[in-house]
């Protein structure tokens, strides 16, 4: 879940 959250954060940043 932490990894998914980080990935989502990066995608949202883009």
Curated annotation (Swiss-Prot):
The keyword Secreted applies. Expressed by the venom gland. It is found in: Secreted. The keyword Secreted applies. Disulfide bonds: none annotated. Keywords: Bradykinin receptor impairing toxin, G-protein coupled receptor impairing toxin, Secreted, Toxin, Vasoactive, Vasodilator. GO terms for cellular component: extracellular region. GO terms for biological process: vasodilation. GO terms for molecular function: toxin activity. Its main location: secreted. The molecular weight of about 4 kDa suggests that the mature peptide comprises about 36 amino acid residues. Belongs to the bradykinin-related peptide family. Has kinin-like biological properties. Causes contraction of isolated guinea pig ileum and relaxation of rat duodenum. Has a number of hypotensive properties: decreases arterial blood pressure and increases capillary permeability. Induces edema when injected into hindpaw of rat. May target bradykinin receptors (BDKRB). Does not lyse unfibrinolysed blood. This is Kinin-like peptide-S. It comes from Lycosa erythrognatha (Wolf spider).
